[in-house]
Amino acid sequence: METVHELLESRGRDGAPALIDAASGETLVGTALAARVAGRVRALVAAGVRSGDRVALLVPNSLACAETLLAAATAGAAAVPINLRWTATEVDHLLADAEPRVLVAADERVRALGPLAHCPLLLSPDAVLASGPLPPPPAPDDTALILYTSGTTGHAKGAMLTHRNLLSNARRIADWLRLGPRDRVLTTMPLFHANAIVIGTLVPLSAGGSAVIAERFRAAEFWASVDRHRPTTAGTVPTMLALLLGEPDPPAALARGSLRFLLTGSAPVPADLLNAFERRFGVPVIEGYGLTECTCRATFNPIDGRRRPASCGVPLEPLRIVDGEDRDLPAGAVGEIVLRGAHVMRGYFRAPEATAAAMRGGWLRTGDLGRLDADGFLHIVGRASELIIRGGENVYPREIEETLLAHPAVAEAAVVGAPDPLYGEVVWAFLAPRPGARLDEGQVLAWCATRLADFKRPVRITVMPGLPKGPTGKLLKAPLRALAGTRP
């Protein structure tokens, strides 16, 4: 299977559960899923969607959301899911860049955002047609999904993932985790992230198993969902593990239940958190590493006794550690992580310069620093960029700084990540006012509230007469990071 269309053809021949709604228990077997997706493909075609178009989605986790993602790809278009926490400004930027043929969203959700300058034709998430033409199937190298990632330049970039990218990574992960028709994944992460789309949906479908789609993660309901739906695994981020640790003990019968293991990634897991979780619940947590540009996962720990906690596991595809001249470094040496393989993206949508910078000599430059130990396990050391990872959400300081600098009273702005016991990192902004202007935390937070998603907003603001600079006038963030790292 090399395309989403072929995956659905395969599942359309079986009567085993494929997708399950966590709240209602509604279950779609393979034949029903294939039929529902075909009905959504017809609705997209009737709305004018053609091969090569984009289909934007602003839909919460649901069977409808998962079906529409599959339908857009099956129609030969690229699905473009939108972060539900974005503001109208952020959504407008995506719509202007992606130029989707349709936006699949409920009217009330779009109205809640406010005016959108680039809103295309709206299509209801309930749109399904029982009859009508179906388009030719897509090719493996057609773009199936465009995921917008926070950009280091201050604007989100669309990573183009092909059918081959998605299916090869899904199959590789399923094989590595030894998933089969009896396995079931509980999907509580949002379906606008690669983790939920790939690990939470495509991996179980490609293995012949099923996915339970929950509207969102709620720590207080997690173990009850495990008891009700009997999943064998679930994807998490470290913040979710911390929230589960903060809940009262579940009944003994629910403490592990059907779970073989949990999967985690998106941010490093503190060793103390990992050990505390496994001791309390008796569920192994399998760490991995990846990024949107490599579809989902590039490494995973083994699921047996060879796993190495505090590492990100071993490569699933070719991975190197290189120096600044692209020379391979020996085991134990720290350098940039670069990747190659069928999981590496096609490129950034309409951004050839950004694509060329990220893809050099056939290798994806991740911007992350790491080392491979003598046994081939990857250890993340830091980030070459200044990326902040807040509860699994990527936040780039440049975007926040540009928003802050647009405030009429702000002369200088610098954003760094500050340690946080729940989210891993949060945003801390350092500001210098314009001459004669007054700045206070409340007015700056109000400014950010209408311009940035909640996870991007600073949780602490420090106003200084001037920000630290070097001899050439370059802003120095090291002293600010030191301040952020020592806060109580």
Task: List each language-model region with its residue ranges.
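Conserved pre-ATP/AMP-binding loop-to-beta segment of ANL
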Residues: 15, 131-148, 155, 178-184
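Conserved AMP-binding/adenylate-forming core of the ANL superfamily
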Residues: 18-62, 66, 70, 87-92
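Conserved AMP-binding A3 loop
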Residues: 27-31, 144-168
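Structural core segment of the AMP-binding/adenylate-forming
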Residues: 42-47, 70, 74-137, 435-437
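AMP-binding/adenylate-forming catalytic core of the ANL superfamily
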Residues: 86, 341, 346-347, 354-357, ...
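Conserved AMP-binding/adenylation subdomain of ANL enzymes
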Residues: 167-184, 192-233, 247
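Gly/Ser/Thr-rich phosphate-binding loop
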Residues: 231-236, 245-307, 318, 325
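Conserved beta-loop-beta connector loops within the AMP-binding
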Residues: 289, 308, 320-338, 372-375, ...
